[in-house]
């Protein structure tokens, strides 16, 4: 999970 069209929280695009 990560930032899918949302403001990036703690992660970016991690599994």
Curated annotation (Swiss-Prot):
- Subcellular location field: Secreted
**What does the tissue specificity note say?**
Expressed by the venom gland.
What is the predominant subcellular site recorded for this chain? Answer: secreted
Q: Which GO terms describe its cellular component?
A: extracellular region
> Which keywords are on file for this protein?
Secreted
Q: Which domain of life is it from?
A: Eukaryota
What is the role of this chain?
A: Does not inhibit chymotrypsin or trypsin.
Report what the protein is called.
Answer: BPTI-like protein
Give the species: Daboia siamensis (Eastern Russel's viper)
């Amino acid at each position: 999970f990560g930032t899918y069209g949302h403001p990036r929280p703690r992660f970016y695009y991690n599994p």
